[in-house]
């Protein structure tokens, strides 16, 4: 999903939420659980690699914001160089953390104004939150969505999808996706 967002927008940088977990690839193994010494100020967290071996350039391409802080997201997107904002609409890897009323609507508005794709990570909430996942339950439509555990029924499976205008970049071969 992140590669697709980068291919569609022509931008390299991404924004994620501090404490958000989106798998074990370099771009998202940033600030999953940074030490308090490394985390930086609460309103402007630092991008902290969670493992050795993550290239410095990757860390520089990831900005981190606090969950439920739309002002911080606005600042992170202001330079106009961000391909996507990836977020769990309901954060579950730090406990069940619901979005504040109006937060996701603000996120949708901010990302649209900045030409940044909004990716909902519904690996856990995709079906478990109800029909249509948290996306349907909370009423905010992302550009792309990732699914896995919630659709697997115990089997290791992953998927992503989204609006045709973005997914067509895979169909026409301008963005490669295999696997």
Task: Label each PLM-derived region with a short phrase.
Residues 2-179:
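Conserved N-terminal phosphate-binding loop of PLP-dependent enzymes in the Aspartate aminotransferase
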């Amino acid at each position: 999903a992140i590669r697709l967002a980068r291919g569609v927008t022509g931008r390299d940088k991404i924004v994620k939420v501090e404490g958000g977990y989106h798998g074990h690839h370099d771009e998202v193994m940033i600030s999953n659980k940074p030490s308090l010494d490394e985390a930086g100020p609460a309103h402007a967290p630092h991008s902290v690699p969670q493992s050795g071996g993550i290239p410095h350039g990757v860390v520089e391409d990831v900005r981190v914001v606090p969950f439920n802080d739309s002002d911080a997201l606005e600042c992170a997107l202001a330079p106009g160089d961000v391909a996507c904002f990836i977020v769990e609409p309901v954060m579950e890897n730090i406990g069940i953390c619901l979005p504040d009323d109006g937060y996701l609507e603000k996120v949708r508005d901010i990302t649209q104004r900045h030409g940044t794709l909004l990716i909902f990570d519904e690996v856990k909430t995709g079906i478990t939150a109800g029909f249509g996942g948290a996306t349907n339950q909370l009423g905010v439509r992302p550009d792309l969505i990732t699914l896995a555990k919630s659709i697997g029924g115990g089997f290791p499976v992953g998927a992503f999808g989204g609006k045709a205008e973005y997914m067509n970049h895979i169909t026409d071969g301008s963005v490669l996706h295999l696997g």
